[in-house]
């Protein structure tokens, strides 16, 4: 059964007020800006935003008044530094920020994907990340007196130094988003999706979520997806809806399709320093455009063409036969 719907239908159905939404799981690339803009257009409220490095998408959703909480490792403009709306919200108390690291966020999502309440780590020990943070709990290792075997040698004949299980650990609480939105290169109508490049925590975020929306640069026949199973990182049975949206990740890059629009990130930084400027920016780039096609039309054909991939780098052909 086809899961292909419009962006308007997908957001209306899958993102009611008050839910937690994971966005921008692939770090600086393939951030689902088109989906985020539809969330803004539909004036969703009370959202919790989840993501490692969301770049400026979180800042836009915050500026529109859609979010009340952020669970992230970093929020800002990767190119320029501060995200003014996020900063204003935290300083004024209208936005709650829960601080995780990239790795601890990955652990939280992975725990939910595995169906376990937490995963252990040592990486937060000695830092203040876990202080007054409900996502961390100090625990004792049940194997504290066990010495790990050093029989496995490293390449070159050098033995691994003996390791002992540290008694003190941090448990990172599982995190299951109500909705995970991901942008991929291509998918079929059933939601089976090809993706390549930097995954970030894409796979963990999809498997941890209660519902999944896949946004694809193009919808292709199922035969195209099945011809390359190793790129099918999202199986259709996990997906609730799929949307075709060309340039849906702009201004972030999509490997093999278009590059990062650095000028747009600079312009956003320059024109959103105040609340009034941010509202004017949203009016021009979100509220006054009906969909992604209208959004891209504002740039003109030359600007869009400049973003298209010029230097191609193809993978070697793969033989899947036996």
Show which residues each predicted segment covers.
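Conserved alpha/beta enzyme-core scaffold
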Residues: 1-322
